[in-house]
């Protein structure tokens, strides 16, 4: 189900007219907030998108699913996301400093 959600999110980004490379960092920041298990982190990441209260509740429910799945789910997801992040398109668009920040954030998540 999570893989389907990820695919759906990536397709939606493309359909809304964004360049996928421009959406890499915001997508991963939001996704990291979801799988972190921290409501505070989730709210911080979602605040950048000015979402509606219903959207926030939906993300909270997704976060609850990750909490229910346990540590295995939370540690595998950052590894998968990190491998997606280093696609040639994303590497061309963002600086090395940006990638370092994202990788550090993903490492923090996988350590919890």
Swiss-Prot record:
Expression across tissues: Expressed in lacrimal gland, at higher level in males than females.
Principal localisation: secreted
A GO-annotated cellular component: extracellular space
Localization annotation: Secreted
CDD domains per the UniProt record, alphabetical: Secretoglobin (cd00633)
InterPro entries (alphabetical): CH2-like (IPR015332), Secretoglobin (IPR016126), Secretoglobin_Domain_sf (IPR053723), Secretoglobin_sf (IPR035960)
Any Pfam family hit: Feld-I_B
Signal peptide bounds: 1-23
PANTHER family on file: ABPBG11-RELATED, ABPBG26-RELATED
UniProt record similarity statement: Belongs to the secretoglobin family.
Protein name: Secretoglobin family 2B member 24
Originating species: Mus musculus (Mouse)
Upper classification of the organism: Eukaryota, Metazoa, Chordata, Craniata, Vertebrata
